[in-house]
Amino acid sequence: MSAIIEAKKQQVDVIAEQLKNSVSTVIVDYRGLTVAEVTELRSQLREAGVEYKVYKNTMVRRAAEQAGIEGLDEFLTGPTAVATSTEDVVAPAKVIAGFAKEHEALEIKTGVMEGSVISAEEVKTVGSLPSHDGLVSMLLSVLQAPVRNFAYAVKAVGEQKEESAE
């Protein structure tokens, strides 16, 4: 086999491994973005711990097949960039959905969450959710509220008894 075909097979294996290991993947059409805008997007994604790469559609198609992900073929037309995260489910969707609001040229094609293909609208919905840390802090705040209110009530009763005793 020629060296080029072997290199392409290795690239497909790398993409397939990336798709298998990612908890969240967003596929976008970046056509119409300037170099500065793409650089800004890459920077934002890097800060969020998201890997962003441009791949040939044929390679992504073969990698998805190898990774056992079905339903991507119809979205793999035109320029395709893939954003993946192995840690935070919300990060790729959040960064890309936010960036797409500011830059209409960026088109969200589809996404993959834990092996299932989701629509562009679902990607935007996931992008509007708080991050894992944000959800945990919200939960803790909700759990703390009754205890905090009880402490305030006990303190108020104590102060009221002190005033009446004086």
Curated annotation (Swiss-Prot):
Oligomeric form and interacting partners: Part of the ribosomal stalk of the 50S ribosomal subunit. The N-terminus interacts with L11 and the large rRNA to form the base of the stalk. The C-terminus forms an elongated spine to which L12 dimers bind in a sequential fashion forming a multimeric L10(L12)X complex.
An example Gene Ontology CC term for this record: large ribosomal subunit
Keyword Metal-binding listed: no
SUPFAM superfamilies associated with the record: Ribosomal protein L10-like (SSF160369)
Pfam families the UniProt entry points to: Ribosomal_L10
Name the UniProt record assigns to this protein: Large ribosomal subunit protein uL10
Highest taxon in the source lineage: Bacteria
Gene Ontology molecular function: large ribosomal subunit rRNA binding; structural constituent of ribosome
GO-annotated biological processes: translation
Biological role: Forms part of the ribosomal stalk, playing a central role in the interaction of the ribosome with GTP-bound translation factors.
